[in-house]
Amino acid sequence: MMLLVIFVLPAGCGDKDLVEVETMSFEQYYLQEKSEICVPEQVVCGTECAWAITTGKNDVIYQVAYGNESPEVKEITWQQDEAEHLISIAYENGKLYAMVRMDEGKTLEIRYYRLGGEFETYRAIEAEAEQGLAVGTLFWVDAEKNVYIAEGNVVTRFDAGTGEKTGITLDGTPCVFLETENGVECLVEESDGIGLYGIEGKNVKKRWKIKKAVRNLKTVRNSDAETLFLVSGSALMLVDRATGTLLAETDLLLMGAHDVLAGNYETEDSTLWLFQKGNGTEGRLEISQFERKEAGTEERRIQLVYGTMGTINEDVDDSIKAAIMQFNQENKNYYITIKNYHDDVDLRRLHAEFASGNAPDILDLTYSFYYESYVQNGYLTDLRPYLERSDYKDDIIWNVLDTYQIDGGLYLLAPQFSITAMAVHPEYAAEIETWNMQTFRTLLEENQWEKDVWQGYGEAERLLYKMLTGRQSEFIDRENETAAFETEEFMKLLELCKSYQESYREDAYEWTSEDLIQNELCMPLIFEDVGTYLSGTEFYGREYALYGYPTEQGQVYGVDVCPDCCGIYAGSPNKEGAWEFIESLLEESHQKWHTGVNKGFPIRKSLLREVQEEWQPITFSNGEKVSMTEAE
């Protein structure tokens, strides 16, 4: 797989602005998707091997050798006493260091390890106050054995000889320490870019800054002393070490990489090793090996942009990230990059791009607040014609997708969905033959507010919101843009709410789960996936019927989309390519993978049945741990 990206080059002195630069590309020729190392927390790289620690309590340190297609993994024991806790590791000048918390946090021991040997204690740092020591977010030891611990924007340096503490304040979050011929340096994640600071004793000097959005800054160890490989979010950047000039950049998703913890690059043979945090609950360490190609290698595929409303720390959900990587590795005509619109400023920029015709080809519609507005303004493509000719057409649960149709058109695809329903207390449920608004009113008359309703706790607004769910069309004429809230039916709803308000329960917010089960006449239930649905039989201790929100004609169930919901920008010149990606979300590899990792029911009937048949009973908590029986 070849890849090419257009890069940005800082110009001028000090702060570096961005202009276009040359390209670089990598080809992957080894991938170990699931190593034996589960839930890695930190990886550091040396010249011959890397070391990894996990989130597992008292787990060993794992040593991973470079240089072959099946990296050898060895286990290194660091623990000398049961009460110890491994906090962090660091590598410098041929030594691996470990920071270990002891004595309930009142002592930190710094230990070092020589290849083939054992850990030996180098220094103990004692707490100066009763509350114990802050372990910090970054730990490092330089060639002279001075210890550095960062917390927030402050670095504390412990002198190798005297142990004297020196506090150093930086203009951002320290992420990586480096040692060069110029002394100790620190890469800092700032609000508007990446800064490099020189540290000499108490003195700090800013060497350069790159003005570029930064997230989860890491480095890839580089045998070339004149350049730095930096990782920020999904970007891999090559930077001039002395000036901060951005020489080249590529997108990790194009390389089939993601969530990089560390890496090692050897200039001599242009080999790059990347260590990545895997997806899913186990999150096994993924190890990839790449070869850098010569400059000028061109990406001949067409670029598609996936616009997401992610967060500042994460662009997209794990399932979409995996789908994009698979698409980039397999598709011969298109590749996808991600553009994140994570705050109000970015959202306004997206709306401006809609108006100018420059919006992303594919749009994340997980948070569909603007869905109707986007459709009305002509920003989204009707996907129904694409679905009608899809091989998956007859396997789709259409009544779920049809929830989102507007004027006969369907402008989003929800590969996964969740369901909101309600349960009626068994004391009253036996009398129900049909379920609609009249049945609901009859229940209320019998109950006389003895039990709460829909967890409204006596608040009229909550009850009105629930009773209007699924009934908007009874009161709002969207075609003629009129509303009728003075009807007899609406007045009846208001009277119910007024009566409900008088039953306000001050203690309801303190109810336990058992109290809720006993005191709720109608309990709202959200089923996020097959597991929550099948295990839900334990709610009342036996099976029970599920109902939708009552309407005059019957009932409606609530449906919500999951983080892989998306649509196609109407102005995209690459709609066919965008559809190829969206249709790939209906493939079994995505449908089942998503369900195994994230919440959601598959939108394909056949796969929903398979997932249901394959689901295993689990132990879950409702007051106390209970295991489902086969009968349940």
How would you label these PLM feature ranges?
Residues 14-69, 89, 102, 175-183, ...:
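Conserved N-terminal structural module of periplasmic/extracytoplasmic solute-binding proteins
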Residues 22-24, 72-79, 120-127, 166-170, ...:
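Beta-propeller fold detector
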Residues 320, 560, 620-632:
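C-terminal capping/gating helix-and-loop segments adjacent to ligand/active sites or protein-protein/ligand interfaces
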Residues 333-396, 432, 515-523, 536-540:
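Extracytoplasmic "Venus flytrap"/periplasmic binding protein-like
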Residues 369-421, 432, 438, 543-551:
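Hinge/lid segment of periplasmic solute-binding proteins
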Residues 397, 407-424, 430-498, 517, ...:
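Extracytoplasmic ligand-binding site segments that recognize negatively charged/polar headgroups
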Residues 479-511, 534-535, 547-549:
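Glycine-centered hinge/linker elements that transmit conformational signals in sensory
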Residues 537-613, 618, 626:
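Extracytoplasmic/periplasmic substrate-recognition and gating elements
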